[in-house]
């Protein structure tokens, strides 16, 4: 895990804050060229970043006490939880919910896991050249835009997530 990205929305679903934290790897310290190409994150950027526990503490403080976390799919939750467990980080995070599952229900396709880009196209959301995919903050931004377009966004609360073993 090399980045945590999040967007904070208010009760009117307006973007009010962002969180972007790179994470210095402690085990696989050399960044694979494919990961660099996909994310746009360089080895030099990671060398100056805090390690996982400090990044998690910053994210936890940013989240505050009255929030829920939305993700697109279940993979990020499992990777995040795996890192929390590995580094013995014990502060509880807010409940996480899967917007991808709500989107599947909205479109009538609960068997396939639609990509974030497909959901954006469905809602007429254009990708921005300044926000390339596969960057945690940008993917969180696009997830927030899809959430804003959902007719009954509170329905996401039916899709709580628990981490699965990787």
Stretch-by-stretch model annotation:
Residues 68-74, 79-84, 115-166:
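Acidic, Mg2+-coordinating catalytic module of metal-dependent nucleases/exonucleases
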Residues 85-89:
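Short, surface-exposed basic-aromatic patches at helix termini and helix-loop junctions that form
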Residues 90-97:
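Short hydrophobic/aromatic-enriched beta-strand-loop microsegments
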Residues 97-113:
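Short alpha-helix plus adjacent loop in nuclease-associated cores
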């Amino acid at each position: 895990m090399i980045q945590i990205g999040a967007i904070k929305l208010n009760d009117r679903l307006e973007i009010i804050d962002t969180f972007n934290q790179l994470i210095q790897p402690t085990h696989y310290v050399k960044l694979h060229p494919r990961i660099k190409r996909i994310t746009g994150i360089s080895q030099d950027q990671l060398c100056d970043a805090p390690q996982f526990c400090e990044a998690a503490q910053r994210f936890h403080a940013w989240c505050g006490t009255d929030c829920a976390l939305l993700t697109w799919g279940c993979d990020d939750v499992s990777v995040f939880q795996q890192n929390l467990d590995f580094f013995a980080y014990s502060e509880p995070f807010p409940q996480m919910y899967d917007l991808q599952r709500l989107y599947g229900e909205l479109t009538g396709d609960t068997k396939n896991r639609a990509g974030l880009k497909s959901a954006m196209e469905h809602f007429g959301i254009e990708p921005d050249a300044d926000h390339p995919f596969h960057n945690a903050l940008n993917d969180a931004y696009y997830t927030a835009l899809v959430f804003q377009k959902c007719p009954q966004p509170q329905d996401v609360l039916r899709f709580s997530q628990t981490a699965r073993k990787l």
